[in-house]
Amino acid sequence: MKKFGLTILLSLCCFFFSNAQDYNTGIGLRGGFSNGVSIKHFITSKSAFEVIIASRWKGVKLTGLYEIHGRAFDTDRLKWYYGFGGHVGFWDGDSSSAYWGDPDTSSTVIGVDGILGLEYSFEEVPINMGIDWKPAFNFIGYTGLWADGGAFSVRYIF
């Protein structure tokens, strides 16, 4: 129990006293039409890989993205980004039966994704917040354009 308490105390100290400038890696939550976990890692000062694991309609989707970041509105803390990638997922088909047909149908989905967003990294705490739009096109399973991929993310950055 003492080790657990010490671990929590050290984590809080790192959280409150670190200076969150540019970051290498961010891990956090993503919420929107689908909710999940986001992990972003920079491979250069302006490019990053992001992995999103999200759930929707009793299923799960894994998305991998390559993103280009740039300074937004002449401030160091606010960045815009765009990118592309792909996804694979497994859905249970639990949606509107009027649109989908048989609501008991399960499906595997495979497709491509784009992303366009803004994110802000706080100076005082290692937290990053972002908003993005991530349209997708499924080639396999529920084929077609999915333009409802907007989300809000909060990440711990280090």
Task: Write out the residue ranges for each language-model feature.
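Gram-negative outer-membrane beta-barrel proteins
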Residues: N35-V37, G59, A72-D74, F90-S96, ...
